[in-house]
A protein has these predicted regions:
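Extracellular/periplasmic envelope-modification machinery, especially enzymes
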Residues: 162-163, 215-219, 241-242, 309-317, ...
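Hydrophobic membrane-embedded alpha-helices
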Residues: 1-387
């Protein structure tokens, strides 16, 4: 989808597939721990999530911040808020409040915009385990009912808001797309599946082939594979046929896609299923293990390698370059950051520090805390001291004055380069709309006297007025903010 491939209009729906998978996995972990121990260790649960998610995210945020400081200083003002929202896992609400569109933009979209989905997931991880533990007092069935009811309510909220405010056409649907309240149906359907489907608990590969019910079991597995194959075809159909401005999508379509995805996951999760074995080939396993890093890095990489802007070429070579860079960076992150930390690298470092000091525990804690505090303070001061040019808000309407009318010669344009923003060189306006007006003509230089003035000179526009035919306005509803300005100019 982000490669702008026209034959995959629904590529953005991959996020919803991962929502269902995340809801399924997290709920499975919580339910099985509660059933096994009678309680959930929230401390260990969130520590595991932190070790899995935070190192790669912090590496991304640090890399993006440094890159912006060095090469994209004009975007620092907006990036500061984006980074803070990402650290707090509220990016989706941050972009809703800033009226940022996921589907339409002028110039470079926010480099961290894709973190909205991680914010939705983390907000779910924060609340859902508490609900599961409370509902588990009445068993799995209660958890399933709660999940299904909440999934339906989320779908209804999206549908009602879409109908009331005209989403997705004529108005932009980003509010209901970003919102946790309106886009949680995938996570919740995955959670419901986790309470109803855990075939690995009853499957013993050593005896599965000799039990009396061999025929019946193999038949059920075959049915599961057939349904899974049909579900896979359904997901592919969504990707190839349903675009971001489909009314169906916002009036129940996301719930349908989530249900189809849940059926696919159910088939893949069966340990005896043929479909699961087919999807477990090494290339797919490789991508699956690194999927988090691939998702984190793909959007920033794509935003600094745009065809026609940072890159002067387009086509499949550019696509291969962008994908290759993403996979390479994700591999480095997985191998040298995510995996070591997940396997206890920080704990081993602290153990070594404790072993080398008289009062090791306090010294190790102070060392780590001091390094983190110093890094955060340095990062915050660096961002605070950098000023963007110009510090315009995302939703502001930008009014720019060109260097000359369309009839100006190349020499005249070069003679006054400071009279216009560097639009042709690719500087981006993150505003929702823009107005481009021709400026007054440059002051005349020394010229030779003409032998004789024309008999009837053509009338020229009054000073301070602009010929309306020379005005071009681009944008959507926010362009109305420039109406008074245009009227004053003529």
């Amino acid at each position: 989808y982000h490669l702008d491939l026209p034959w995959v209009p629904g590529g953005f729906l991959g996020v919803d597939v991962f929502f269902v998978l995340s809801g399924f996995l997290i709920t499975t972990l919580v339910v099985e721990e509660v059933e096994r121990t009678g309680r959930l260790s929230y401390r260990q649960f969130y520590l595991r999530r932190a070790r899995r998610l935070l190192p790669a995210l912090w590496l991304l945020l640090a890399s993006v911040s440094v890159t912006a400081l060095l090469f994209f200083r004009e975007e620092i003002v907006e990036l500061r808020g984006d980074v803070l929202a990402a650290l707090l896992y509220v990016s989706n609400w941050w972009y809703i409040a800033a009226d940022v569109s996921y589907f339409e933009f002028t110039g470079r979209p926010p480099v961290l915009q894709h973190l909205w989905s991680l914010a939705v997931e983390e907000q779910f991880y924060l609340v859902w385990p508490v609900i599961v533990v409370a509902a588990m007092a009445a068993g799995r069935r209660r958890v399933r009912r709660v999940a299904l009811v909440l999934a339906v309510l989320s779908t209804l909220a999206m549908a009602v808001l879409s109908i009331r405010y005209g989403y997705p056409v004529p108005n932009d649907p980003s509010r209901v797309y970003f919102g946790t309240d309106t886009h949680a149906m995938g996570l919740l359907l995955g959670a419901a599946l986790a309470t109803a489907w855990s075939p690995w608990r009853r499957y013993d590969p050593a005896t599965a082939w000799v039990r009396r019910s061999f025929v019946g079991r193999r038949f059920r597995v075959l049915i599961t594979d057939v349904l899974g194959a049909a579900a896979l075809a359904g997901v592919v159909w969504f990707f190839l046929n349903v675009g971001e401005f489909s009314d169906f999508l916002y009036r129940g379509g996301f719930l349908v896609l989530s249900a189809v995805t849940a059926a696919l996951i159910a088939a893949l999760a069966h340990p005896a299923g043929l479909l699961g074995r087919a999807m477990a080939v090494q290339p797919l396993r490789y991508l699956g293990e690194r999927s988090y890093g691939i998702y984190l890095w793909h959007w920033p990489v794509f935003m600094v390698t745009r065809p026609g802007f940072e890159l002067g070429v387009d086509g499949w070579p550019v696509h291969l370059l962008r994908v290759g860079l993403t996979l390479g960076i994700a591999e480095l992150s997985y191998r040298y950051v995510e995996t070591p930390i997940r396997h206890g690298a920080i704990g081993r470092l602290m153990s070594r520090a404790r072993a080398r000091t008289p009062d090791g525990r306090q010294a190790a804690t102070r060392l780590v805390s001091g390094v983190l505090a110093l890094a955060l303070v340095a990062w915050a001061i660096g961002l605070a001291m950098v000023r963007a040019d110009p510090p315009a808000g995302r939703s502001a309407t930008s009014v720019s004055v060109g260097a000359g009318a369309s009839s100006a010669s190349a020499g005249q344009a070069e003679a006054a380069p400071a009279a216009r923003p560097d639009v042709s060189s690719g500087d981006e306006m993150r505003a929702a709309g823009s107005v481009v007006l021709p400026p007054p003509a440059p002051p005349p230089g020394p010229t030779e006297p003409a032998p004789e003035p024309p008999a009837e000179p053509k009338p020229e526009p009054a000073p301070g007025r602009v010929d309306p035919s020379q005005v071009s306005a681009f944008g959507d509803s926010v362009i109305f903010g420039a109406v008074d300005y245009l009227r004053d100019r003529g």
